[in-house]
Amino acid sequence: MEERVLNVELRTKTGKGISRQLRRNNFIPGVVYGKGMESVPVSLSTKELSTAIAGEGGRNHLLTLKGGGGLDGQMVIVAELLQDCLKGTPRHVDLHKINMADKVRVKVPVNLVGSAVGVKEGGLLDFAMHEIEIECFPTHIPEHIDVDVTELTIGHSLHIGDIKELPGIKVLGDATVSVVSILGKVKEEPVVDA
């Protein structure tokens, strides 16, 4: 996955009032934290953050920070992004500093590949798990995990344990949890007028 640059500025003041002022000026408050360091409050451009996490892979892009206070050149990933529930705009971001020599746990999107036999037979595809948690080195984070549904028939499911692991990537979670299923045909009952 490609690395992207994210400009940040150190924040000396914190609180609701400062956060509101930042948002009015198209900036959002954030914090950078990680192993062996104190949390550092920062602010960053809303547009720049949206651009940095746009596209497939989203929040899992490796971001190189540019800014003062010893943050210049630090590698981070978006640990949490709070968004306005009505507008969908970012309100706060947590950036997790990562060590390239340590494995990280991230959630990646599931990409369904192929046309399921069960769907062709009239079944209904139930895509239950859109993201899967994995563990790998930061340079091995995939944009998505492909799951082939071609052979899936009515009444059958693919579980986390059925996902083929890629080299250097460990799929986490309960192996018995369903990722995708093919449900049986739905019978339509005639509508009876009263």
Swiss-Prot record:
InterPro entries: Rbsml_bL25/Gln-tRNA_synth_N (IPR020056), Ribosomal_bL25/Gln-tRNA_synth (IPR011035), Ribosomal_bL25_b-dom (IPR020057), Ribosomal_bL25_C (IPR037121), Ribosomal_bL25_long (IPR001021), Ribosomal_L25_dom (IPR029751), Ribosomal_uL5_bac-type (IPR020930). GO terms for molecular function: 5S rRNA binding; structural constituent of ribosome. It holds the Pfam family Ribosomal_L25p. It comes from the Bacteria. Signal peptide: none annotated. GO terms for cellular component: cytosolic large ribosomal subunit. GO terms for biological process: translation. Keywords: Ribonucleoprotein, Ribosomal protein, RNA-binding, rRNA-binding. CDD domains: Ribosomal_L25_TL5_CTC. This is one of the proteins that binds to the 5S RNA in the ribosome where it forms part of the central protuberance. Part of the 50S ribosomal subunit; part of the 5S rRNA/L5/L18/L25 subcomplex. Contacts the 5S rRNA. Binds to the 5S rRNA independently of L5 and L18. Belongs to the bacterial ribosomal protein bL25 family. CTC subfamily. This is Large ribosomal subunit protein bL25. The lineage of its organism: Bacteria, Pseudomonadati, Thermodesulfobacteriota, Desulfuromonadia, Geobacterales. The gene is rplY.
